[in-house]
UniProtKB/Swiss-Prot annotation, chains A, B, C, D, E, F:
Organism this protein belongs to: Heliobacterium modesticaldum (strain ATCC 51547 / Ice1)
Family affiliation: Belongs to the acetylglutamate kinase family. ArgB subfamily.
TM annotation in the entry: none
GO cellular component: cytoplasm
Residues of the site described as Transition state stabilizer: K29, K253
Descriptive protein name: Acetylglutamate kinase
Amino acid sequence: MLKALEKAGILVEALPYIKKFSGKTVVIKYGGAAMVNDQLKEAVIMDVILMKLVGIHPVVVHGGGPEINGMLDRLGLKSHFIQGLRVTDESTMEVVEMVLAGKVNKEIVALIQRFGGKAVGLCGKDGGLIQAKKRFELVKNEGGARVPTDIGFVGDVVKIEPGLVRELADRGYIPVIAPIGVGEKGESYNINADTAAGELAQALKADKLVLLTDVEGILRDRKDPSSLISSLRIDDVPALVEEGVISGGMIPKVACCVEALQGGVGQTHIIDGRLPHSLLLEVFTDKGIGTMVLK
Amino acid sequence: MLKALEKAGILVEALPYIKKFSGKTVVIKYGGAAMVNDQLKEAVIMDVILMKLVGIHPVVVHGGGPEINGMLDRLGLKSHFIQGLRVTDESTMEVVEMVLAGKVNKEIVALIQRFGGKAVGLCGKDGGLIQAKKRFELVKNEGGARVPTDIGFVGDVVKIEPGLVRELADRGYIPVIAPIGVGEKGESYNINADTAAGELAQALKADKLVLLTDVEGILRDRKDPSSLISSLRIDDVPALVEEGVISGGMIPKVACCVEALQGGVGQTHIIDGRLPHSLLLEVFTDKGIGTMVLK
Amino acid sequence: MLKALEKAGILVEALPYIKKFSGKTVVIKYGGAAMVNDQLKEAVIMDVILMKLVGIHPVVVHGGGPEINGMLDRLGLKSHFIQGLRVTDESTMEVVEMVLAGKVNKEIVALIQRFGGKAVGLCGKDGGLIQAKKRFELVKNEGGARVPTDIGFVGDVVKIEPGLVRELADRGYIPVIAPIGVGEKGESYNINADTAAGELAQALKADKLVLLTDVEGILRDRKDPSSLISSLRIDDVPALVEEGVISGGMIPKVACCVEALQGGVGQTHIIDGRLPHSLLLEVFTDKGIGTMVLK
Amino acid sequence: MLKALEKAGILVEALPYIKKFSGKTVVIKYGGAAMVNDQLKEAVIMDVILMKLVGIHPVVVHGGGPEINGMLDRLGLKSHFIQGLRVTDESTMEVVEMVLAGKVNKEIVALIQRFGGKAVGLCGKDGGLIQAKKRFELVKNEGGARVPTDIGFVGDVVKIEPGLVRELADRGYIPVIAPIGVGEKGESYNINADTAAGELAQALKADKLVLLTDVEGILRDRKDPSSLISSLRIDDVPALVEEGVISGGMIPKVACCVEALQGGVGQTHIIDGRLPHSLLLEVFTDKGIGTMVLK
Amino acid sequence: MLKALEKAGILVEALPYIKKFSGKTVVIKYGGAAMVNDQLKEAVIMDVILMKLVGIHPVVVHGGGPEINGMLDRLGLKSHFIQGLRVTDESTMEVVEMVLAGKVNKEIVALIQRFGGKAVGLCGKDGGLIQAKKRFELVKNEGGARVPTDIGFVGDVVKIEPGLVRELADRGYIPVIAPIGVGEKGESYNINADTAAGELAQALKADKLVLLTDVEGILRDRKDPSSLISSLRIDDVPALVEEGVISGGMIPKVACCVEALQGGVGQTHIIDGRLPHSLLLEVFTDKGIGTMVLK
Amino acid sequence: MLKALEKAGILVEALPYIKKFSGKTVVIKYGGAAMVNDQLKEAVIMDVILMKLVGIHPVVVHGGGPEINGMLDRLGLKSHFIQGLRVTDESTMEVVEMVLAGKVNKEIVALIQRFGGKAVGLCGKDGGLIQAKKRFELVKNEGGARVPTDIGFVGDVVKIEPGLVRELADRGYIPVIAPIGVGEKGESYNINADTAAGELAQALKADKLVLLTDVEGILRDRKDPSSLISSLRIDDVPALVEEGVISGGMIPKVACCVEALQGGVGQTHIIDGRLPHSLLLEVFTDKGIGTMVLK
């Protein structure tokens, strides 16, 4: 009978979180290991469906996982580089869009539907959702000066038109979004998925932005999982970067959180997608999980 | 980390039940030990609030517990009997109503509000909710014939007017109902709480009627808790009564379930209110609890 | 035929008042003789129903009448005094609540229902309607200093949560409210009914607050009913208190009106509940009745 | 004080009628003396506004009074007769329409607006309200046979399109209707106002049709007002016609009532428009007034 | 096949205009030749219906055409003049109102209905639409001073109550309005139709005000239609008046446009009603037509 | 000025069709030349946007054009055949889905958005829109018997879930649908686009199904465009097939129309997509275009 009591206890523990987030929007950047491993994939889907069922509005923004590279390989498309920066030429962009919006996106949708949720797959073209323009990276030229350089169809977000996402969410659907932006002439741009999630969270005035990653969160000592920093504030970031605690691939993720917070998002989280149901644990339990970045 | 995974598993296990009962009405007869013990009381309240939060419409019908007798004693009101049947005279009825509608009912309401739910306490007079008339019990007279006998202000339900309960439930409130009926002239009647819950469940076209009792459910061998009959059908009832498996105080409870099922209620449950969170376990877990009576 | 014409004239006279108050809220403090005498009781109920029918939203806040003392006597509960101030101990509060919320309140509800209206009986616990805290009266100690003194479960209003009352009123119900407040831990407090009515009128942004009393209104000469002051302004009050025209039990009633007016209530009225249909006459006729206090 | 009590009594007497007719539609044929005398006119307007204010939906269909003939005279238009039947030629019809829809109709509207109501004046052309076709009267020819004869722009109702009237009534307006019908080519037809009122009452599924006339109602002895038949059933009509009790101009009025009743109208009334506020007295008092014809 | 392509091209050309004006209000002053010639009349009606069908809200304000003078003549009513200004005495006003509101207005309504639209005819009395007061013209007295002079029932707009027009437009009707104003005592006033249209356009926050006239628009050289000024700004007006380009009857029309623009109307147009479908061409084609006056 | 009049005439000619189809659903199968030629593509998009603007609900179902084969070639995927029937293996299906749902679909969406419409691209997985199962073609085996044969991921429609399409259409979006079906386990199936359009039209209770093809319609003499059969009934079909007038690729198209008509669609059309704006001409002009098949 103890087991039963524990069950009940866990359900009751979720109560204040359900109450707190009821009717609120949570934007989830879905990527990394959790998109590859079947068991993890299913766990994420179940978590998202459960959130929807208890009255939260989850919005999923996904990356492309290894599938894009696989397809580029099969087509024999080789990447071209400018000063070490990969260039997304038109053929590559075509493949990126097809894989993201036509395969990965629709697979996630089908999985949600199969487990009892209602989902709609969108890209940035649908309803003018993600309006973008070409990004110019600053690249050192021969003279050593950093000049804006065309790296192809990689885009910066110009405007988010969140109406369609809101309407779908309000009518019981889970919007699943491929981070393809659309330019003025209808051309496609590849948008970084973290960035797209962050911008969308701002436009939707989301209460939470959750980035599913392949690390435990921010560790004070990268080799020691027990050194996890479970919560930090925007003001703490510069010092942590200085000290090298936030470094490498974690820098853009933290930057994305900071920008989202400054744009009005309530809380941001960098959590470990390799742990099954990390999303659920983050949202519905007392302890939370990973690193929370707050204003 | 195992602990976390288990937590998630239990939340995910609840998913199909949340989906199944979302927007549905569950009428709960709240009585017995679960109204006396503070810890049990709190557990029932938490269960009801959680049900409401995830989109179910719980409706609570409560008994009076030991408080009525306590107040009758303090007032020196002694019960009068006719052929062994207790008579509810006007003074007694006055006390019953005050204690039920003015004390027990409002205490439950205050408890729900305190733990974060929204509740409204009603009796059968509010919005004409429970319309009743005097019940005449068949009592053997001196000649041995069973004649209808006036046993005072004990009532039979004439009509349920469920509008108010529905409106409150739809607007986010948990209706808490004292089983006081109202007669044509505005007089009060004491209604059996199980009966009131069953009638209300029918009028609301509830999906579930749950009776919180002080037994494990229906036991094949009353001394052996492991002999619990976890599910039975209406058709099985006569034989079980014949065999004495259903006997004593369990007979009216089962009768109440049968009537509710025949009146259109989806499922009925006799569960053990002495077990903390038995309500939650019944609704949100795979195993269920107690005895389910089905059509 | 003259009779008929007069009838019509009276109905037509009501026309501008119906127009003026259509959709507006009128809070009525119901107490005194009008709660004791059966004919007066019925007249008040009819008046309230008529107001509702023509599109006004009446909200009734009632006192306890002599019933509380009757029950306290029957239970042999004797009042305890501190420096002449009656103390409401826990046993007394229990009785006050039961009688107010479980008996008087539900009787009024049953009467409205019986005469064709729709009513719901509430106390301050329902929907967190009247949130209160312990009141400390300033009492002279032995040294003659006035110190805050615990007089038991007598409360001051901390906050009114008017949502439930509005929702019920909008859906065609007449809310009937027992002035029991609820503390942070769910404990009950006895609230002065005039005060509760005044606070509720403010929270509901009521257009009218009407206090049914056992006097004609404010009389310049207490022995001469013809000296009725039919209208006065807040600014006139201090002088009238000075002169002794407003004195005794009239002081808190006028204070209640003044506070309500300062809190945004349109008009306040002190009228004679001993006169049948005084409420109706106040609202629907040219002459009004009793004393109106205006800003 | 007695006066006040009487006032209240009359208001309370209206209560069940307000309740009964709340949200119901009452079609009023407004004509005769009540359209000529200024005091009577004002009384009718007040009655209609009061009905609207208490939640009834009055719809006014008016006749033309003496104004049409006045204008025909001023224009020197002389009526042309066929076998004693007046013919409405095109010039006459033009005047009828202008006076009815452009003068009488708008005057009533302006009066309602001036006394605080909201009104919209319509004729049968607005929203296709009254669709009509030419009526052919059966007229004896030289040979004595009754043949259908063209009497000009007099019309029979082909179809009522009640949508516009309902929409206006639901939004708080009192529709005021001139009985001008519209033919397939947009041509105008003069429709008998009683007939138009009766047809409209059927199309609107009205609860009451009230014909304001210049007699007390149906009198058993035309010379004795005390011989008023206050209520009769459809089945009684043939005998009363036979006996001559219903005769002359009363025959088409009663026929109009009978047809309305058969078309689903709840009650029909022939009342005395010469009595001020007869409409109000009919609707809101116990005694009613005039003759009620029931199914 | 070329023909078909052209057809399609014209429909496609209308696309941006449909999009631009969808849900917007266009007030049309309907007068002059377009009210006399049957073919022009029909073309205007078709244009208005088409506008409604594609989601625009046209509101028609009409003049009286030659019909008023015709009726005045038939009645032998001769105009009385004060210093050259025609006086609208009570008899004249009666005729004006009957003809405008009872004949011209309802004919337009019938025509719209006949061609498949839904229309309601209103005058300024309906719903208190156009509230007016007597206008006093400044007239030179014998001493040569300009003194305010009573010229009878000619009115200035005091207030527009646009609620009824909006409600009808929202429910699919085309409001057709006779420019009769109503005074405080319910008396009628003749309002200049251009002025009424302009005031209504302001009160409705219309996007367009279109005046149908009997000229091509504003011509730089009145004898040369090719000298049409297709667009001008408020600031250009004084100079054009100075130069005599805007003169005579065009002055009040331009003044009406200027006032409407200053009152918040988006665009105003003076177009040639003698050209069939000029309204349609103005709204739905690239070239527009007539003279547009802009802020 | 003649030109202007013609313009107006064409707009007015569209009026009855706008009226007729306002609020109705038109399903368009978009394929063939109209998907390849840029000018035709743009014309179709403009037509669809215009339909939406005037209140019609167009729903676009598209084919894949030559793009699928292009991508298959680039990937070196060769088709495998069974008895002459092409087999869609898993790799091929993956490409079909990516190209249809990720490239062609989103390009159409982007085009609609760019020209001012609002569009959402869906495939059969979104909201469970097209539920399918594997199709088994009857193929002659060696013994000559026709046996059901697995031809890979080609599907038959099991169920259409039209909710999402309706919700989007009601909220102003043009749904653009790639004919990918989803199986019970979330697997993808290639569905014939004509069939998908026909099934969707039935599920949506569409008023029109329009198939854009690369022929003029059904020609009695295939070499003579003037022999176009502009309208035929279901009953005429068998004889026309017998005579060879309906033959080859036209047979499944006509079958699709017949099935749609039997499933409740109002009208079906086979029109020439090679003609610019054929869609517009079919819907908004008197002559229609291509062949209409009616019940």
